[in-house]
Amino acid sequence: MKRIHHFTVFVFCVLACAGAVAQNGTREINYEGLKIIFKKTPKEVVTASLFIKGGTANITEAQQGLEALSLSLALSGGTKTMDKDAFAAQADKLGTSFNATASKDYSRMTMTCLKDNWDKSWAMFADAILNPSLNENEYKVIRDQMVSAAKQQESNPDANLRKLASDQLFGGSDYAKVPNGIPSTLENLKIEDVKKYYAALLGKKKCFLVVVGNVEESSLLNNIKNTLAKLPVGTDPKKPTFKSVTEPTTNIKDRAIATNYILGTLNAPKYFTTDGPLFEFAMSILYDRYFVELRTKRSLSYAPAAFYSKNTIEQPTASLYISTIDPKQSLQVMTDIINDIKKNGFTEKEVKDKKKEYLTDYYMTNEASAFQAGQLGFCEASGNWRMFDEINNKIDLVKTPDLNKTFNKYMKTIDWTYLGKEDKVAKEDFKQLAPSDEKLPVSDLKKTKRQ
């Protein structure tokens, strides 16, 4: 399991004639109805991403994978003026890359290029978006690749565990749908479905553009003028339906596999709220405690994890994860660690040390233009792109008592999912957390010896 920190700096906003400017040079521009978030940097690599809001709210259950397939085909299947091979050859010559990704809340079409090749690369990017060939032969190739990838996901225990947990928590809502599709839905999609869907997808109300790199604003607007500015107004983006953890639940799925996989899911605050960044910070410290107690001291798992998942913007989650041959002891230790924090809180030292690590991570991960574009887009989809520049100030101001209060506020009911040997666990092994105001039992964490 991977942790990805998303960080954001305090912003002073002033109004300029074309849009709002942030202290760090990030600028919001409204150009003929299209929202543009432009961050000028000294980097010689430029990234442009067109975000489409809605995510899985845009598709039905039978259409799972349709948006991802449509965008991938548009960017890699050639255009009406340049076939796939010619398009790929030109991209290689320029050193330009194109890719499309889909998530539960939005999709993204991205181009990354060298500054010197900005104009030519933009022309290709805009041509692919506005005039894709949507060729049937290329469609079949991409669809088959996606079917193969979906089948591999089904056979991967970690991916299977996440799918089981998502179905259990979000079942029947938009967030239960798989953006990249499942084999049965992908195999039933036709080229006509793709053409019809793509023709109605893009519009200024639903889309926004993020550009990060060393290009002039005048060059950017000039390139947009005769391309994306021509997008139709379109329809308002749809808000996804979702569910929350409301009561203790345990789903045990029997599998004859060597290692047992466990995922606990809890409700978490939305990222753009006051509690969001604090809770993410707290979960990062919990991750460290899990690593020490579950891996270093007990060797119960190679990669235990605790993290704040923002993959579902309207209902983020806290995740408790472990793969282990001893699920009983692992479950006990996982909940003991949290109960210990709820009782005694985080220490001043670990909060101070984590601040340094967090901010170092921020500066290192934010060097790439593609990463910055992705995080600016995520923050905009979450409510406000300025959040991207607020994390430094918020983390610097974190006080241990506030962190403990935020952690206790959300560490309540756990939705457990288990994939492994059924005879290794019983329902009662899947513990729930003690209430925050309840006197907790003395932790036995220090007494348990390494196995």
Identify what each model region corresponds to.
Residues 22-46:
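N- or domain-start disorder-to-order transition segments that initiate the globular core
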Residues 27, 35-39, 196-199, 247-254, ...:
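Short, surface-exposed beta-strand/loop micro-motifs that present aromatic residues
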Residues 2, 89-235, 298, 303-451:
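Charge-rich, well-structured scaffold segments of protease-associated domains
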Residues 43-45, 104-106, 204, 246, ...:
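Short, solvent-exposed loop/turn segments at the edges of secondary structure
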Residues 42, 49-54, 236-289, 293, ...:
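His/Glu-based metal-binding/catalytic segments typifying zinc-dependent metallopeptidases
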Residues 49-112, 285-298:
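M16/MPP (pitrilysin/insulinase) zinc-metallopeptidase core fold and M16-derived inactive scaffolds
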